[in-house]
A protein has these predicted regions:
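Gram-negative outer-membrane beta-barrel transporters
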Residues: 707-709, 719-721, 725-817, 852, ...
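N-terminal periplasmic "start-of-domain" segments of outer-membrane beta-barrel proteins
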Residues: 38-71, 97, 105-108, 120-122
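Repeated loop/turn-to-beta-strand initiation elements of outer-membrane beta-barrel proteins
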Residues: 210-211, 301-304, 382-385, 473-476, ...
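Outer-membrane beta-barrel translocator/receptor signature
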Residues: 124-131, 140-147, 154-256, 260, ...
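Solvent-exposed loop segments that connect transmembrane elements
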Residues: 227-278, 318-360, 405-447, 498-512, ...
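Extracytoplasmic beta-strand/coil segments of soluble accessory domains associated
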Residues: 77-120, 149
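C-terminal beta-signal and adjacent terminal beta-strands/loops
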Residues: 711, 808-815, 835-884
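Outer-membrane beta-barrel signature, preferentially recognizing the C-terminal barrel domain
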Residues: 354-369, 557, 561-568, 622, ...
Length: 884
C-alpha cells in the first residue's frame, strides 16, 4: 500500500452545532452578520447545507431535516441522491443501498448518531452483510445527514468510499414544546393499491432548558407489485448436443436438422438463458418506527442523553415465476427444433415437448430492530469528555416459505433477439400460460417448506477526551472504543413430496390488465398469464396430514446455510485540530485490533452430505491489526474560495456472508458457491482534493477529485469443482463461486456540483460524478457506475413550493452469479413534489415518485442476455403536515 499519509476530518464541532440549530429553526427568518435577510423554508435549509460544508475541515456534504422532508421520498437514501458522488440502487423501486465515490455499498458505513445500528434484510436470497438497508430508516427521525467523503481518526473505521452519519432530533435542541405530524395516502399505479401513512412527534423541555423528552412514531405502508422478465443462469448450445456432465443431452437434437444442425455444430459455446419467463411479485411492506429521547442537563457543562429506537417491519410477499426451462435435465423427452445464433448468443430457440415451470413461493418475512443508547457529555472551557455505550439487536429474514412447483411439457419458442430494448418473448403452440389445468406438481418433488431467519447484534462502548488550547493548536482529542458484533443465519427446510395437484386447485385468476405494461416485445400469452392465490396454497400445504417439520439436515443446501460470525474490535485514536490564519485542519491516527470467529457447518471430505453425521461445525479464528493515519487540510485561498486536501489509509472488513463457512450446491443446474473465512480486509490509500467557490449568497460551484488505491480487493471467482450430486446420484462437476482477495483495485474520478438560489424564488441543484473503478486485469468493480448525474430545479415563494428531481447513473457491475458476470443497465429516475402551506402550521404536499416507471435491467455478460428486467410502478403520495 502507499504512504502513511494523514487524513482528513469532517465538519468542526461548532459547524455541526450551528447546522443542527439552523435545521431545527429553518422556518424562521435569520439575519447573518452582514445584515442580509436569509430566506425561510427549503431555500434556507439548502443554505444551511452550504454553510456546514463551508465551515467543515473535511470534504463533507450535509442534508438537513428540511431537505429530507422536501424530497419526494420514502426513505433517507432517496434524500442522498443529490449528494455528489452518491448513487442509489433501486431493485425494488426505492433506495435500499448507497454507493459513495464509485465503491460497493458494503465498503461504505452508515452510522446513527455515530454508532452502528443492528439491521437485517428480508429477502430470502440476501445474506447478512455490512450494507445498511435504508428502507428501514424513517425520514421523520432525521435531523441531519452528514456524508463524510474522507475520514477522521475520531470516526469509526471500516469505510473506503465514505461514511454516512444520520443524526436524530434531540429535545433540548428544539423549541420548548413541539407537536408535529403527518397523515397521508400512498398509491402505487402498478399494484393499483394504496394505504395510509402517518407520523407524529412530540417534544418538550422545561423553561430552564435542563430537561427534555421527545417521542415519535411513524407508520409507512407500501403495497407494491413488481412485474418482470427473468432468466436463471446461462447454458451453452453444446448442452443440447450431449456435452453435459451426464454425457447425454438434456434436450435431444430431435428435429434440429439442416440449418439448425449446422448452426448447433458451428456454435457450441453460444450462450442462452437456462430458463426464461415472466415474474409476478406482490408484497405488502409495513414499517412501524418508535423512538424516544430523554435529555438532562443538571449543570451547564453536563448533558446526559438516553435514546431508544425500535423498528418493526413486515415484508410478506408472494412470488410467482412462470418460465420455459430448456436447460433442465428433466427435459430428456424434449427435442430442439430450431436455433438462431448471432455473435455468440443464441437469440432464438424452439423446442418440442419441453419443460415449463410455475414456481409459487409465499414468504413470511419480517425485521425487528431495537437500540438503546446512552451518552454522558461534559464540555468545559478547557476540556471535554464524552462517554457512550449501547446495545442494538435485530432479527429478520424469511420466517417461513411455502413453495410449490408446477410442471408442464409443451412446444414453445424463446426469442431474445430484440434484447435489450425488447428483452424477450415466450410463445407457446397452445396457450398454457393462461391454462391453470396445464400445470401440476410432480409427486417426486413438489416443493418445500423453508425458514431462513437472520440475527444481527451490536454492543459498544467508548470514551473520548478532548483538551482545548489557544493558538494554532486548537484541540487534542484521544479515545478508546470497543465493539462486539455478532451476525448469522439459520437455514432449515424440508422437501414436499407425494403431491400431484394441478395449479387450478388454488383459486387462480388472470393477472390484471396492466401486467407487464411498459415492456416492449411481449405477447398476449405472457401478458395474460394466470396467478394462483397464495393463501389457498398455504392453507392446502399446511393442512396436509403428517406435514414434516423443516430441518437443517434435510438437504445439503440447508445445512451449509447455517453460520455465525463474531467480531471483536478495539480501537485507540489520537487527533489534533489546528488553525493558523487561512489554514485549518486535523491530523491523527487510529489503531484498530480486529478478532473474528467464523463458524458454520462443513461437509466431511468424501461424504454424501445427506445425513447429519456427514457434517461438522467448524470454527475459524483470525485477527489482524491496522494503523490508520489521516490528515486533512483546508485553505481559504480568498474569502469565497476554499481548497481542501485529504490523505488517509483506511480499511473495510469483508462482508459477513463472504467470511462465513456457508456453502451451497444446485444439483440440477450444476452451480454452487460459498464463503471464505480466511479473507483479509480491504486496505486502501485514499486521496481527496476539492476546490469550492462560494460565488454568491446561498450558492456554490465545487469540483472534487479522488483516488483510491485498494489492496486485498475481494471478488467472486468461479472455478470448476467436483461434488456428489444427489439428483444424479454420482459425482459431477459444478461451477463454484467463492470470494477471494483477488489483488488490487483502483478507483479514480472527479465530481462537479452546482447549487444556487436564484431570484424570484427559483433555484437549482446539479452535479455530475465520474468514477473509474478497475481491478486487476481490468475487472469491473461492484456497483461502480462510471457516470452519474442529477438535476433538481425548484421554486419556493410564499405558500407554494415546487421541486423536480432527475437522477441518472450508467451501467454497473453487481457480481458473479452462477458463473456469469452480472450487470445492471443504465437507468434514470424522476420525482416531483408540490407543497402548499395553508397556514404557517398546516401544509399539503403532493409527491410523485418514479414518474417514468423506470426499468431495472439486470443482465449476464452482455445486454443481449437479460437476467432480470423489472418495473415497480409509479408512486403518488398525498400528505397533510402539521407543525405547532
Amino acid at each position: 500500500m502507499g504512504i502513511r499519509g494523514f487524513l482528513i476530518g469532517t465538519a468542526s464541532a461548532m459547524a455541526l452545532l450551528t447546522g443542527a440549530a439552523h435545521a431545527q429553526t429553518s422556518d424562521t427568518t435569520t439575519a447573518p452578520d452582514d445584515g442580509e435577510i436569509v430566506v425561510t423554508g427549503f431555500r434556507a435549509s439548502l443554505a444551511q447545507s452550504i454553510d456546514a460544508k463551508r465551515k467543515a475541515d473535511s470534504i463533507i456534504d450535509s442534508v438537513s431535516a428540511e431537505d429530507v422532508g422536501k424530497f419526494p421520498n420514502t426513505n433517507v437514501a432517496e434524500a442522498l441522491t443529490l449528494v455528489p458522488g452518491v448513487t442509489v440502487d433501486r431493485q425494488f423501486g426505492q433506495g435500499e443501498k448507497v454507493s459513495i465515490l464509485g465503491t460497493d455499498p458494503a465498503l461504505n458505513r452508515t452510522l446513527l448518531n455515530g454508532q452502528t445500528v443492528a439491521s437485517a434484510d428480508w429477502f430470502i436470497l440476501d445474506s447478512p452483510g455490512r450494507t445498511f438497508n435504508y428502507a428501514l430508516l424513517a425520514p421523520q427521525l432525521v435531523n441531519r445527514v452528514d456524508v463524510y467523503k474522507s475520514p477522521e481518526a475520531r470516526i469509526d473505521e471500516g469505510s473506503i468510499g465514505g461514511t454516512v452519519n444520520v443524526l436524530t432530533r434531540k429535545p433540548l435542541e428544539l423549541k420548548p414544546f413541539v407537536v408535529a405530524g403527518s397523515l397521508g395516502y400512498l398509491y402505487n399505479d402498478r399494484s393499483e393499491k394504496g394505504d395510509v401513512q402517518g407520523a407524529a412527534l412530540v417534544s418538550w423541555h422545561n423553561d430552564a432548558g435542563t430537561f427534555g423528552l421527545l417521542a415519535s412514531f411513524q407508520r409507512a405502508k407500501d403495497r407494491l407489485r413488481r412485474d418482470g422478465l427473468e432468466s436463471y443462469g446461462t447454458i451453452t448450445a453444446d448442452f443440447w448436443a450431449g456435452k453435459n456432465d451426464a454425457g447425454t443431452s438434456s434436450i435431444t437434437t430431435g428435429n434440429c436438422t439442416a440449418a439448425c444442425a449446422t448452426t448447433l455444430t458451428a456454435n457450441p459455446g453460444a450462450k442462452f438463458p437456462n430458463a426464461f419467463g415472466t415474474s409476478y411479485f406482490a408484497q405488502d411492506r409495513e414499517r412501524l418506527t418508535y423512538s424516544a429521547t430523554a435529555q438532562w442537563k443538571p449543570v451547564e457543562e453536563l448533558t446526559i442523553t438516553a435514546d431508544w429506537l425500535r423498528i418493526d417491519a413486515t415484508y410478506d410477499n408472494l412470488n410467482q415465476s412462470m418460465y420455459a426451462f430448456p436447460g433442465n435435465v428433466w427435459n430428456s423427452a424434449g427435442s430442439l427444433t430450431g436455433l438462431t445464433v448471432d455473435n455468440g448468443v443464441v437469440t432464438k430457440a424452439s423446442f418440442r415437448n419441453a419443460l415449463s415451470v410455475l414456481d409459487a413461493q409465499y414468504r413470511v418475512a419480517e425485521m425487528h430492530s431495537q437500540t438503546f443508547h446512552g451518552q454522558i457529555g461534559w464540555n468545559d472551557v478547557n476540556w471535554d469528555l464524552n462517554i457512550e455505550g449501547g446495545v442494538s439487536d435485530a432479527d429478520g429474514g424469511t420466517k417461513k416459505q411455502v413453495f410449490l412447483e408446477f410442471l408442464n411439457w409443451a412446444d414453445y419458442t424463446v426469442d431474445i433477439s430484440g434484447a435489450p430494448d425488447k428483452p424477450g418473448t415466450l410463445s407457446y403452440g397452445s396457450n398454457v400460460l393462461g391454462n391453470p389445468a396445464a400445470f401440476a406438481t410432480d409427486p417426486g418433488w413438489s416443493g418445500n417448506l423453508v425458514n431462513k431467519p437472520t440475527i444481527d447484534k451490536e454492543r459498544y462502548g467508548q470514551v473520548d477526551l478532548g483538551l482545548k488550547f489557544d493558538g494554532s493548536l486548537k484541540r487534542w482529542s484521544f479515545g478508546y472504543k470497543y465493539r462486539h458484533h455478532e451476525t448469522g443465519q439459520s437455514y432449515a427446510g424440508i422437501a414436499l413430496t407425494g403431491l400431484s395437484v394441478p395449479a387450478g386447485n388454488f383459486d387462480t385468476s388472470p393477472v390484471k390488465d396492466n401486467y407487464l405494461s411498459g415492456f416492449d416485445g411481449i405477447n398476449d400469452q405472457m401478458a395474460g398469464r394466470f396467478i394462483i392465490n397464495g393463501d389457498s396454497m398455504v392453507n392446502y400445504v399446511q393442512g396436509r396430514p403428517n406435514l414434516p417439520t423443516p430441518s437443517m439436515f434435510a438437504a445439503a443446501e440447508f445445512t451449509a446455510g447455517n453460520w455465525n460470525i463474531k467480531e471483536d474490535i478495539q480501537a485507540l485514536y489520537s487527533q489534533i485540530n489546528f488553525e493558523q490564519g487561512a489554514l485549518r485542519g486535523n491530523i491523527g491516527a487510529r489503531y484498530v485490533h480486529t478478532k473474528t470467529e467464523s463458524a458454520g457447518f462443513v461437509c466431511r471430505p468424501g461424504a454424501a452430505c445427506n445425513a447429519q453425521a456427514d457434517w461438522i461445525w467448524q470454527t475459524t479464528t483470525r485477527s489482524y491489526d491496522n494503523v490508520l493515519p489521516s490528515v486533512n487540510v483546508a485553505i481559504a485561498l480568498q474569502k469565497d474560495l476554499t481548497f481542501r486536501f485529504a490523505a488517509s489509509q483506511v480499511i473495510a472488513r469483508p462482508n459477513y456472508a463472504d467470511m462465513s463457512n456457508y456453502f451451497w450446491l444446485s444439483d440440477q443446474i450444476g452451480t454452487g458457491g460459498g464463503g471464505n473465512p480466511d479473507l483479509k480486509p480491504y486496505e486502501s490509500t485514499n486521496y481527496n482534493a476539492s476546490l469550492e467557490w462560494y460565488f454568491a449568497p446561498r450558492a456554490i460551484l465545487a469540483a472534487e477529485v479522488f483516488y483510491k488505491d485498494i489492496g486485498n480487493y475481494i471478488l467472486q471467482k468461479t472455478a470448476r469443482e467436483q461434488y456428489f450430486n444427489q439428483f444424479v446420484g454420482a459425482v459431477t462437476t459444478y461451477n463454484i463461486s467463492r470470494p477471494f482477495n483477488a489483488g488490487s483495485a483502483k478507483v479514480k474520478g472527479f465530481a462537479i456540483a452546482y447549487q444556487q438560489s436564484l431570484p424570484l424564488g427559483f433555484g437549482v441543484l446539479a452535479n455530475y460524478t465520474y468514477a473509474d473503478g478497475k481491478g486487476e486485469d481490468g475487472a469491473d468493480l461492484p456497483y461502480n457506475s462510471r457516470h452519474q448525474a442529477s438535476l433538481s430545479p425548484f421554486f419556493e415563494s410564499g405558500p407554494v413550493a415546487l421541486r423536480a428531481t432527475y437522477t441518472w447513473r450508467s451501467k454497473y457491475f453487481t457480481g458473479i452469479d452462477r458463473g456469469d458476470q452480472m450487470y445492471v443497465r443504465d437507468s434514470a429516475n424522476v420525482d416531483v413534489s408540490a407543497t402548499y402551506n395553508i397556514t404557517k402550521e398546516i401544509g399539503l404536499t403532493l409527491s410523485g415518485m418514479n414518474l417514468t416507471d423506470s426499468q431495472y435491467y439486470a443482465y449476464a455478460n452482455t445486454q443481449r442476455l437479460p437476467r432480470g428486467v423489472y418495473k415497480n410502478g409509479r408512486k403518488l403520495l398525498a400528505t397533510v403536515n402539521v407543525n405547532f
